[in-house]
């Protein structure tokens, strides 16, 4: 009984020591990578690339007749679930910008595509820097990955929304039990999509093999923080409308920038968590030698105690 208690305490201390070592290493890593500065840079690039990205996405959807009319549905879904405040204003401005972009010539549309590619390249560079990857992919491979994300990404999202809408129209969903389950699934869809997006980002973008369990944990942490920040940010904007008071009709600009900056902080934090989980040896050594299995052996501990007591008795006898 006493041995079990000692074993439990040792394991608890071991887990506590490992957790403290990991959090210390993670904090040091975040400071070294200047996460907040990198997030600000990515937010700036994102705002510059936002309209070109949406234009390319809508163009990819319109190229397939089966997805006709899904562009606006997808845009509404993204704004309602991923932009917590000033969603209608953002939607109005984006529609105007995209409509103006649609009037451009082929050269202008090509320039928009290049700008959208620059955003993908910035994401690639930021995440590979976090993973300490110095070897770059060949340009052909990078272009293929960016093209796949820009084309297949919206198609897959549009397909999921189309399937959800189709299932919602079936007579099979008339029963209360099935309908309730379907409604719960729809409510969880933004969380599932954000988790899947983070997981794919942490698995595919770094130019090295990332453990699925590490990427999954980082994605779950990032998606949880994303949902909490979405609700918290919306609550702050609605209860403390300082931006509207100061900027008036232009308040949507700083609101959108702050939100995009916060999103990139979460994305990069999830990447730091995922990358640091794969550096176990480094964060173990950063806090000294880890507790080994020998330290957890109760018999060894008891033997050490006996040796100490016998040495104390021998010293007394010598005196």
UniProtKB/Swiss-Prot annotation:
Main location: membrane
Membrane-topology descriptor: Multi-pass membrane protein
One protein family per Pfam: Virul_fac_BrkB
UniProt source species: Photobacterium profundum (strain SS9)
InterPro entries to which the protein is assigned, alphabetical: UPF0761_bac, Virul_fac_BrkB
A cellular component term, taken from the record's GO annotations: plasma membrane
Residues annotated as transmembrane: 50-70, 107-127, 143-163, 188-208, 215-235, 249-269
Family statement: Belongs to the UPF0761 family.
Name assigned to this protein: UPF0761 membrane protein PBPRA3489
Compartment list: Cell inner membrane
Acyltransferase is among the record's keywords: no
